[in-house]
């Protein structure tokens, strides 16, 4: 049965405030799962199971699948579609409030468009060893952007600091129901060995990109004494991820010293 048929069978009405668009092309789901290369020993977390197109393909690998879906009206669809897969655990709750993600899990998701930013932050926070995510094409460009590009900013830096990023392929809007106004991109994220306090780092990056066209001297004005002798004439968008981490470490150490 097709995804659209499941939705019709159970009279599912899309919720605009959730920005719901469901992957309906199982060829795309198969391609994503093939890229991941799952084994029955793996634990996979899916954020936004929707109508279960991707969930079903993940389940076929034999891996343990934990699928989050905030919209309980989709429960009948998911339960019927996944009834023959005992390796799937459906959690009808908000992933952003999740409290028990298994260590070493892999995230494979068609991320809900309306909350991409917060979800990407949670992926970093939960330290997924790998994440294969499908996002709006524009968001994918921001995740992958390099210094000096218009799309380079907060999201680029926080993701690339903690993950090696790679574009896999684009997905046409025609592969979803209803058809969104934009195409999507599938991105592969592999965790780096980085020992940073994500919450503090996130705040620092947010601060230096607060006024994107301003120089570091302007955005770091309350902390100029920390960066004495450092060139602050550039803008944050001109700095590499590595340079931003160096600036962050100076700022962090200065804050810690001031509390002693």
From Swiss-Prot:
User: By its UniProt entry, which InterPro entries does this protein fall under?
Assistant: KsgA/Erm (IPR001737), rRNA_Ade_diMease-like_C (IPR023165), rRNA_Ade_Mease_Trfase_CS (IPR020596), rRNA_Ade_methylase_Trfase_N (IPR020598), rRNA_adenine_dimethylase (IPR011530), SAM-dependent_MTases_sf (IPR029063)
Q: Which residues does the record give as S-adenosyl-L-methionine binding sites? A: 23, 48, 69, 94, 110
What keywords tag this UniProt record? Cytoplasm, Methyltransferase, RNA-binding, rRNA processing, S-adenosyl-L-methionine, Transferase
| Superkingdom assignment | Bacteria
Under Enzyme Commission nomenclature, its number is 2.1.1.182
Catalytic function, reaction form:
adenosine(1518)/adenosine(1519) in 16S rRNA + 4 S-adenosyl-L-methionine = N(6)-dimethyladenosine(1518)/N(6)-dimethyladenosine(1519) in 16S rRNA + 4 S-adenosyl-L-homocysteine + 4 H(+)
Name of the top EC class for this enzyme: transferase
**SMART domains in the record:** rADc
GO MF assignments: 16S rRNA (adenine(1518)-N(6)/adenine(1519)-N(6))-dimethyltransferase activity; RNA binding
PROSITE patterns named among the record's database cross-references? RRNA_A_DIMETH, SAM_RNA_A_N6_MT
Location in the cell reads: Cytoplasm
The record describes the protein's role as: Specifically dimethylates two adjacent adenosines (A1518 and A1519) in the loop of a conserved hairpin near the 3'-end of 16S rRNA in the 30S particle. May play a critical role in biogenesis of 30S subunits.
Instruction: Please state which protein family the record places this protein in.
Output: Belongs to the class I-like SAM-binding methyltransferase superfamily. rRNA adenine N(6)-methyltransferase family. RsmA subfamily.
Q: Which NCBIfam families does the UniProt record give?
A: ksgA
- Per its UniProt record, what HAMAP family does this chain match? 16SrRNA_methyltr_A (MF_00607)
Kindly provide the name given to this protein in its UniProt entry.
Answer: Ribosomal RNA small subunit methyltransferase A
**Organism ancestry:** Bacteria, Thermotogati, Thermotogota, Thermotogae, Thermotogales
């Amino acid at each position: 049965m097709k995804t659209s048929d499941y939705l019709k069978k159970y009279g599912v009405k899309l919720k605009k405030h959730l920005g719901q668009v469901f992957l309906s092309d199982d060829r795309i789901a198969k391609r994503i799962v093939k890229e991941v290369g799952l084994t029955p020993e793996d634990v996979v977390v899916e954020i936004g199971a929707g109508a279960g197109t991707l969930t079903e393909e993940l389940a076929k690998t034999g891996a343990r699948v934990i699928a989050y879906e905030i919209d309980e009206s989709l429960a009948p669809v998911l339960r019927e579609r996944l009834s023959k897969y005992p390796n799937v655990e459906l959690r009808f709750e908000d992933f952003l409030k999740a409290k028990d993600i298994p260590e070493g899990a892999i995230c494979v998701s068609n991320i809900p468009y309306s909350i991409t930013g917060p979800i990407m932050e949670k992926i970093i926070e939960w330290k997924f060893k790998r994440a294969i995510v499908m996002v709006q094409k524009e968001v994918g460009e921001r995740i992958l952007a390099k210094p000096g590009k218009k799309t380079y900013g907060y999201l680029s830096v926080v993701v690339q600091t903690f993950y090696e990023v790679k574009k896999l392929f684009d997905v046409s809007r025609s592969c979803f129901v209803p058809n969104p106004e934009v195409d999507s991109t599938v991105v592969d994220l592999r965790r780096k060995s980085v020992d940073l306090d994500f919450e503090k780092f996130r705040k620092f990056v947010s601060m230096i990109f607060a006024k994107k066209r301003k120089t570091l001297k302007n955005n770091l004005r309350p902390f100029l004494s920390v960066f004495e002798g450092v060139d602050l004439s550039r803008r944050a968008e001109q700095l590499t991820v590595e340079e931003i981490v160096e600036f962050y470490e100076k700022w962090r150490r200065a804050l810690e010293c001031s509390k002693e």
